[in-house]
Amino acid sequence: MEPFGARLRRAMDERGPLCVGIDPHASLLAEWGLNDDVAGLERFSRTVVEAMADRVAVLKPQSAFFERFGSRGVAVLETTVQEARAAGALVVMDAKRGDIGSTMAAYAESFLHKDAPLFSDALTVSPYLGYGSLKPAVDLARESGAGLFVLALTSNPEGGEVQHAVRGDGRSVGATMLAHLAAENAGEEPLGSFGAVVGATLGDLSSYDLGINGPLLAPGIGAQGATPADLPRVFGAALRNVVPNVSRGVLRHGPDVTALRTAADRFAVEIRTAVTAS
């Protein structure tokens, strides 16, 4: 399979960089008039895929909202991933997995092995058992043509106590993760497959080298307070590689498919305007 970075760059060029989250939490199901059960989960997920999969570059299901329903919820997640990919969207599985050795390898196989029922184009992972603990996922992603998004500078305020902590060599933990990713992506064209999660809410990041030659998944737009107009200030010269993620800002307009598409299109235009004007 063609590497994830190349497929993502093409999707961003053709569809724009917007990523829409699939986050079926109980309050959102209620807003849609759906029960907080497997049937509601399935209806919600199918509607988002119908509305979005043929028009946005990336869909990002949050696995926890499916896992809470046990095996039946995971079955819905499998169908959601497969239908989204079949309709043309790239799927980033937001599972934030992180462990060591054979356990990390098993997590990787669950989402990155080409024959896995939950095979996704990319997976979010946590490096806070040490970046080297991610090696099984890095290796399998390369083999499968998939990608990773490593938590580096996240949008939640609590993340700073770890990610902004300064190591003995004077670099912050977040900067160290970015440096590892730059090394993974060295020489890759048109875009490396190993990205970072960098929050759009963080303000000026000019002290960080975001030039990792890989994608930057940017949560925080919409409900968390960031806007598309903030992207040039936050990401600077790396703006072209940013994949802005919007979840509630789009999903709250459901369950009407047309309303969901209109909301996504509005964000897409605002993002395009911000990128073009920078």
Swiss-Prot record:
CDD domains: OMP_decarboxylase_like (cd04725)
Keyword Lyase: yes
Alphabetical UniProt keywords: Decarboxylase, Lyase, Pyrimidine biosynthesis
UniProt-recorded name of the protein: Orotidine 5'-phosphate decarboxylase
Pathway(s) this gene product operates in, as recorded in its UniProt entry: Pyrimidine metabolism; UMP biosynthesis via de novo pathway; UMP from orotate: step 2/2
Any one GO biological process: 'de novo' UMP biosynthetic process
SMART domains, sorted: OMPdecase
Pfam family, any one: OMPdecase
Family: Belongs to the OMP decarboxylase family. Type 2 subfamily.
Stored PROSITE patterns: OMPDECASE (PS00156)
Catalysed reaction equations from the record: orotidine 5'-phosphate + H(+) = UMP + CO2
Active site (record annotation): K96
EC number: 4.1.1.23
InterPro entries linked to this entry: Aldolase_TIM, OMPdecase_AS, OMPdecase_type-2, OMPdeCOase_dom, RibuloseP-bd_barrel
NCBIfam families: pyrF_sub2
GO molecular-function terms, A-Z: orotidine-5'-phosphate decarboxylase activity
Species this chain originates from: Streptomyces coelicolor (strain ATCC BAA-471 / A3(2) / M145)
Lyase is among the record's keywords: yes
